[in-house]
Amino acid sequence: AVQFPDGGSITIIAVTTLSGGDITHAVPDNTGYITEGQLYLRRDSNVGKVIIDPFRSLSRLKQLVIGKKTREDHPQVMNAAVRLFSDAAGAQTKMENGFDLTDYDERTLSFAADYSRELLAIDVNIDTEQMLDTAWSLFGKYFRPAEVNIKQQLVDKYWPKA
């Protein structure tokens, strides 16, 4: 990356494709690049879109920005959304293995579909404020405040009004 004295920068974005989606392929495993972050894209068959996979993506710089240069609720919303998305992955596994799903499982699956479609899909183009507002809207649609596990002062301020 290059940063110019009068402002602006150029960042090199390397793209690695995996033959047949095989993440164990030797070429990407042996590149050895140290990056400031990576976005792992995959097709979400439940919504038919390519999404940013939050479990395999990483950012070494987010802690410098999130909640400091973004809205106060950003860290808690991010953590809650990823946790609920993870709960949905567990519910998906239960369903695939023939186990009964609880009401909570059903709601996490519905949440995950909307979360993928409205926030993780690569064709989504919204700013951070809209992203946070959308996440709160999804929380309110599928969960009770206690299930989301976000500080009460943030729930009081941002939870969607009925």
Regions found by a protein language model. Give the residues of each.
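P-loop NTPase catalytic core
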Residues: A1-A162
